[in-house]
Amino acid sequence: MTLRTITLIAGPTASGKSELALQMAQEKNALIINADSMQVYDVLNILTARPREADTAIVPHYLYGHVSPTLNYSVGQWLCDVEKLLVTFTSRSVIFVGGTGLYFRALLEGISKIPHVPDVVRQKWRLLLNKEGAESLYRQLLQIDAVVAEKISSQDGQRIVRALEVYDATGEKLSWWQKQKTTPLIAPSRAEKILLMRPRALLYERIHKRLDSMIERGVLEEVVAMKKLMLSPSLPVMKAIGIPEFMAYLDGYRSFENALEAAKTQTRRYAKRQMTWFRHQFDEEWMLTS
């Protein structure tokens, strides 16, 4: 019996990951699983550059557009969905493709088993943050969990509060919980790992062309559909690049040209952050290709 192959394809936005995955999936008779935290959401088909119907008709694609934009979909939920697929398709070769580095890390290393923090505890620490300020709470964190405190800025109120609320709710330091990881779904030695990194000038050109193409394909209709849902700005889907920019255009605060240029600028910045993250976080086992 031939063992199935596991392939991971990571890279910055607009680098051509989906095209490479489709090509390899046909060669390996594999299915494709999404590893991009924005492509999981429904409605934003064009804006998040999900695979087109012509591609999904050729090769089965999973975990694309299966989550309501009203939800906050976590890496833990993604791992649960992945595990179900791996159990269902035990003998089928699989290709994971996407630009969310944390998804790949969780897949290969597991994730910390941090318990749910009750809303009353979370609210307590957020009120204290507003009342006392980040630096005051940071001094408390230094006394409670110096390991975590030394990794974050004394001005980073959100991360300071997160560490304090976990300790308050569980009696254990966040640094302790971070070591209690789930068993990885995939052993790193079992996977072929590909990091697709285009030359920066070429990548930026691809980004610009893709956004122009999105306009032609009707991306503004998706933004209108999102606007009608009247979602909280704090939801992850509302932070997708293009949503704030094009909503500002629809509301009359930006010209169309300005909104499009802003979306291109934000996408370039995002791609640069992705490239930096991949270079620092992925080891030499990832095969670099352009």
UniProtKB/Swiss-Prot annotation:
Q: Ribonucleoprotein: is it a keyword of this entry?
A: no
Q: Which cofactor does it need?
A: Mg(2+)
Under the heading InterPro entries, the entry gives: Dimethylallyltransferase, IPT, P-loop_NTPase
Q: Which residues bind substrate?
A: T13, A14, S15, G16, K17, S18
Q: What is its EC number?
A: 2.5.1.75
| Catalyses which reaction(s) | adenosine(37) in tRNA + dimethylallyl diphosphate = N(6)-dimethylallyladenosine(37) in tRNA + diphosphate
Class in the EC hierarchy, top level: transferase
- Output the Gene Ontology terms for molecular function: ATP binding; tRNA dimethylallyltransferase activity
Residues covered by region (Interaction with substrate tRNA)? 36-39, 158-162
Domain of life of the native organism: Bacteria
Q: Binding of ATP: at which residues?
A: G11, P12, T13, A14, S15, G16, K17, S18
Tell me which UniProt keywords the record has, alphabetically.
ATP-binding, Magnesium, Nucleotide-binding, Transferase, tRNA processing
**What are the transmembrane regions?**
none
> One Pfam family name from the record?
IPPT
Site (Interaction with substrate tRNA) found at T100, R122
Any single GO BP term? tRNA modification
Q: Its function?
A: Catalyzes the transfer of a dimethylallyl group onto the adenine at position 37 in tRNAs that read codons beginning with uridine, leading to the formation of N6-(dimethylallyl)adenosine (i(6)A).
- Binding partners and assembly: Monomer.
NCBIfam families, per this entry?
miaA (TIGR00174)
**What does the similarity note say?**
Belongs to the IPP transferase family.
Identification of the protein by name: tRNA dimethylallyltransferase
Q: Which organism is it from?
A: Bartonella tribocorum (strain CIP 105476 / IBS 506)
Its gene is: miaA
